[in-house]
Amino acid sequence: MSIEEWDAVIKVHLRGTFATTHHAANYWRDRSKAGDPVDARIVNTSSSSGIYGNVGQSNYGAAKAGIAAFTVITAMELARYGVTVNAIAPAALTRMTEDLVRWQSDGEDAPAWDPRDPGNIAPLVAWLGSVESRDITGRVFNVRGGLVSVAEGWVAGPAEDKGARWEPGELGEVIPRLVAGARANSDTSGRTPTA
């Protein structure tokens, strides 16, 4: 991957998300400061590639991970103005992904309800954009077919506090123990492998 390819994907996804949020946030902030009531929503689009990883998509995954983090942070920043900010990480079959997965018929007709249909994503976006969702902010939601789940993001795991600066040689004993006590990283669909 070239630097230009990296920059192009980051610019479209991460900068594009920032640009629209920037202008909307300025508008709502000005309205709020003028004393007008604001009850607004932002719904960003992340990806499972950004929150769980996917081999061969480091530029896309980094951009989408940035959008997930941007969502959490802007939710904190815009709450005082009456704006909620959430993101979806959709999985659907689109023109861009149709060559990756094709219906394997084996003589069968395609199912009447296709869990890969992009239309399955719309109800969550509509709900997140509604008044009913006003108490939900700073969340990233996985949505695939009929499945909706909350991506729980980074959390602090096992720790050891020496109370002083560590020496590199001391960490050779500590880090493997901390990693052994931590949850395993999830697979590309967000599931944590079981032992």
Residues of each region from the PLM?
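Substrate-binding pocket helix/loop in short-chain dehydrogenase/reductase
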Residues: 2-7
